[in-house]
């Protein structure tokens, strides 16, 4: 359930994220919560003309800069060994960004182990697997 919760001054986006944080804490595992942003694709300007709808001006040519495509995982190991993305319910953008994120990480010398728990049981399994790393 995506109900925001505050714990120790940290605002978690869901109950499952809070559960994950507390279980990592209980296990003595250090984790950074939403602290590392990855740029999956740099922003740019399209060099040719693009016609797009505008709120008040109708269908017009635009030169709007395309912003960076970024990804901020939920939990990151400070030593770079693992990343946890807690996802109870995926939104429509998540599957594409997750694929882009995995592709980005594969370009690194030593990509981390990725975990995508979707419920409390999988969070507990994730923590046991992290202990073995």
List where the protein language model places each region.
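Electrostatic, structured charged patches in enzyme active sites and in nucleic-acid/phosphate-binding
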Residues: 1-133
């Amino acid at each position: 359930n995506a109900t925001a919760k505050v714990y120790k001054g940290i605002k978690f986006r869901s109950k499952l994220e809070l559960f994950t944080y507390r279980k990592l804490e209980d296990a003595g595992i250090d984790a950074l919560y939403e602290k590392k942003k990855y740029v999956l694709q740099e922003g740019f300007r399209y060099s040719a003309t693009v016609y797009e709808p505008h709120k008040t001006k109708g269908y017009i040519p635009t030169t709007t800069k395309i912003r960076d495509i970024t990804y901020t995982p939920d939990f990151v190991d400070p030593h770079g060994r693992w990343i946890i993305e807690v996802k109870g319910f995926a939104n429509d953008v998540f599957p594409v960004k997750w694929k882009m994120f995995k592709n980005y990480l594969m370009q690194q010398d030593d990509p981390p182990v990725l975990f995508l728990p979707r419920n409390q049981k999988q969070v507990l399994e994730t923590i046991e697997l992290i202990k073995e790393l």
